[in-house]
Amino acid sequence: MTGNQQMERQHQVAIVGGGPVGLALAVELGQRDIDCVLVERHRAPVRIPKGQNLTGRTLEHFYFWRCVDEIRASRVLPPGYPIGGVTAYGNLMSPYFYWAHTGGRGPRDQDYFFQRNERLPQYATESVLRARLRDLPSVTTHFGWTAERVEQDDDGTRISIVPSDESAFYSWSADAQQVSPQASDARADRRVLRAEFLVGCDGGRSLVRESMGIERSGRDFDQRMVLAVLRSRELHEALKRYPESTTYRVLKPELQGYWQFFGRIDVGEGFFFHAPVPKDTRPDNFDFLGLLHEAAGFAFAAELDHVGFWDLRVMTASRYRQGRVFIAGDACHQHPPYGGFGLNTGLEDAANLGWKLAATIQGWGGQDLLDSYAQERQPIFRETGEVMIAGGIGRDRAFLERYNPEKDGQEFEQAWAEFGRRARSARQAYEPHYEGSPVVAGPPNGVCSIHGEPSLAAQAGHHLAPRLLSNDRNVFQMLGQGFTLLAFGAEEAAVRRIDEAARSLRVPLVVVRDSFDAERAAYAARLVLVRPDQYVVWAGDGAPADPMTLLRTVTGQELRYGAGRGLPNG
């Protein structure tokens, strides 16, 4: 169709934005046979190497999305290459530095997560997810289309889409020293898509969020940042002074707590670089090579492949839902790429919202289940942004104002060692949980928070730790697409009561039986109820006093116990 002709088709879920979060949500829904449509303005993934660090928890999602092997095969770094970072004072040639490993060591990774972490460019992650979508017949994709307008009414949601005009996207040519517009397409065709629900995964400048009148709050640091993509063999060789690392950040007083940092794209010559720059900086009026040399501490030959800019903000949406419309990923939370939280947080949004949308559409999720998405996810990012990111900038700034190696070298060395130790331990204390969720039978006065301690014990509101069964398979290999009841040495009558309650409510439930010994004893409960995103919603040694109320609570059909109120055992 051409001109002003329009085509309407009804879907169950429409997704605006097909970056990694939107793609992941489409996979999550498609695997549950939900009819969804995805609209993405780019025809192909944009080859800018951001969002590279994928945690062990995120790799669990890819396992359940049935493409974890493809993710690992898409890595650019050699298998087993250490995922960790160097922090240096002044520049990368400084004698003052510390190193922090962020992959595959200790209970957080080997014991607490079923998968080890991975590192690859975001465009490679997107390519894997796009390929996975091709195997899911219930998902329709519109790549190269842009959402122009979003509306909702009592009957559903409505999106007007047009072919993308990619002349709005620019590339930086280091040779020509200018920006060049890409080829554009005429907006000759308009279409209208309808859906029961709509999810905006369309980034920090979200059309969906703005159309719904959802405001954001947080902190705007009023700081322009540059993202440069470069190739330099000389830089690679110079960085051999450090243990093998994936990131190299520089702290110094004049940066006021902001970072200059390099990240590896590959092992050999590919890097990206972030740093604060003056507000009026453009690709054609700034010495970017000079900035790279300043951060590195020496001059080196380099080829610039891309230069872009972003504004340093830590922002959270006031709400994640407006009627039938939801937002996820950067559309509801935005922050600088400090700490590797961004993409992982967005993918957790997708996993959380996806099963709840499917449950609601399929009829076994109650009217309150969808509200629990924001009730769980919003406080997690608010604390992440305020404590880990904005708070981290403040802590770095305070340290740099207080200590200086030129004034008191011994005092600085002692403080720097302690500074590094605290930086390493802070991330180890990051354990997002939903103890205060209204759809979790959590402890009295529980709250949803990032502050916790990874534990092998099964705790309501916390991520399930993977354990081996007596047949040498992992518990995670037995988890169902719906709820799963782990019954380890439990009385059969108790198992039967919970199973019968689930059947009567049409809640999909898989029962995994085994003995209560060996690794399974670490759960400290003979009965563990696990929801579709691998979080524990209830644990005990005997059946709850009212299994029907338990199942209604954790599926949003009844909030009798409310947030943070436990269900006693019978």
PLM regions and their residue ranges:
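Beta1/beta-strand and adjacent pyrophosphate-binding region of the FAD-binding site
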Residues: 7-21
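Core beta-strand elements of the Rossmann-like FAD/NAD(P) dinucleotide-binding domain
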Residues: 9-11, 186-197
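Conserved mid-domain beta->alpha element of the FAD-binding
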Residues: 17-27, 31-33, 62, 129, ...
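Glycine-rich FAD pyrophosphate-binding loop
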Residues: 30-51
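Active-site-adjacent segment of FAD-dependent monooxygenases/related oxidoreductases
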Residues: 47-50, 55-132, 254
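Conserved FAD-binding catalytic core of PHBH/FMO-like flavoproteins
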Residues: 131, 139, 181, 197-314
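A conserved short coil-to-beta-strand element within the FAD-binding core of flavoproteins
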Residues: 143-158, 163-167
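C-terminal helical "tail/cap" subdomain of flavin- and related membrane-associated enzymes
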Residues: 318, 358-463, 470-479, 483, ...
